[in-house]
Amino acid sequence: MTPLDRAHLAAEDDGTDTARLTFFERLAEAELHLLLDDGDSRDGTITPRLFEIEGTRYALAFDLPDRLTDFAGAAATATLSGRRLATMLASENLGLGLNLEDAPSAQLLDPEALRWLNRTLAHQPEETEARIQEVSSPGDIPDALLTALDGKLGLAVGLARTGYLAGVAYEGGARGHILGFVDVVPGAEGDLARAVSEALVFSGLDAGQIDVTFLRAAHPLAATLARHGLRIDLPVPDAPATPTAPGTDAPPRLR
């Protein structure tokens, strides 16, 4: 059983918004195998095989190669992340037939569901400036948020050494939470900020807010966050490589 299977069954059994959000989070993170009409992908262009059901056209994708083979036999495929596929299909008003026919997660996702997922993933954090007055313990953090952060940052291999989640008070009286990343790879700041933003949304706490900052280990605030905050260690790459965040490469063009 795959992570998508487990997330789909949990959403069906639980029935809560949080469980459904978790399914869409797993879908965005999954590596999917898209069924193509042919093997021609020159110039970055691919042609998905489409099926029309009750007036809606669907592309078909599977989270395991064997599932695609069982459904379609030997066929041309393209492998891409769920978030990239959502972007592609939403732009063409296409739905997604996922893991048809016998998988626990088999279902049809209509174009509106993919547009919602694409809008959610396209959200960009806002950059602001504020002067910190006090750093404190983060207090009681909802388990759903901690789980979502663990899942998102678990994919950010090599993008930073560590992070600290703490309570914060700003000049002017505003209070909240801050997640400070230490020794971030240059250029990875936006990817990490988006990962935290998505963790909030997919935990069901999108009305909440976590401020994100990026520090060198020698910065005084890094030591303060280490004293008061909850430490979050990011995965270290197995071998030296240029780190990249998942799903950030440009999607191929549909034809």
Where are these regions (language model features)?
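An interfacial alpha-helical scaffold signature
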Residues: 1-255
